[in-house]
Amino acid sequence: MKASMFLALAGLVLLFVVGYASESEEKEFPIELLSKIFAVDVFKGEERGCKGFGDSCTPGKNECCPNHACSNKHKWCKAYLGK
């Protein structure tokens, strides 16, 4: 009887330790995933080689991405509609 109680108690302690270890790993996973998704280096405009919508530009230098044009009035890239 004492052996079975000891074995049951040891099993519960082992289950608690394994559950705690897996829970701590699960808590770190979303943080790592979000830090990789929202990393600042990934979304830099300089890596594209062209400027997107709303980026400042100099008219006549063709700095904007395709389907965008530099506005003479506002000096930022706007969607080019063909006119």
From Swiss-Prot:
Keywords of this entry: Amidation, Disulfide bond, Ion channel impairing toxin, Knottin, Neurotoxin, Presynaptic neurotoxin, Secreted, Signal, Toxin, Voltage-gated sodium channel impairing toxin
Tissue specificity remark: Expressed by the venom gland.
Residue ranges annotated as propeptide in the record: 22-48
Ranges annotated as spanning the membrane: none
Leucine amide modifications at: 81
Annotated signal peptide: 1-21
GO terms of molecular function: ion channel inhibitor activity; sodium channel regulator activity; toxin activity
Cysteine pairings via disulfide bonds: 50-65, 57-70, 64-77
Subcellular location: Secreted
Function: Lethal neurotoxin. Selectively blocks tetrodotoxin-sensitive voltage-gated sodium channels (Nav). Does not affect tetrodotoxin-resistant voltage-gated sodium channels or calcium channels.
Subunit: Monomer.
Family membership noted in the UniProt record: Belongs to the neurotoxin 10 (Hwtx-1) family. 15 (Hntx-3) subfamily.
Record-given protein name: Mu-theraphotoxin-Hhn2o
Species this protein is from: Cyriopagopus hainanus
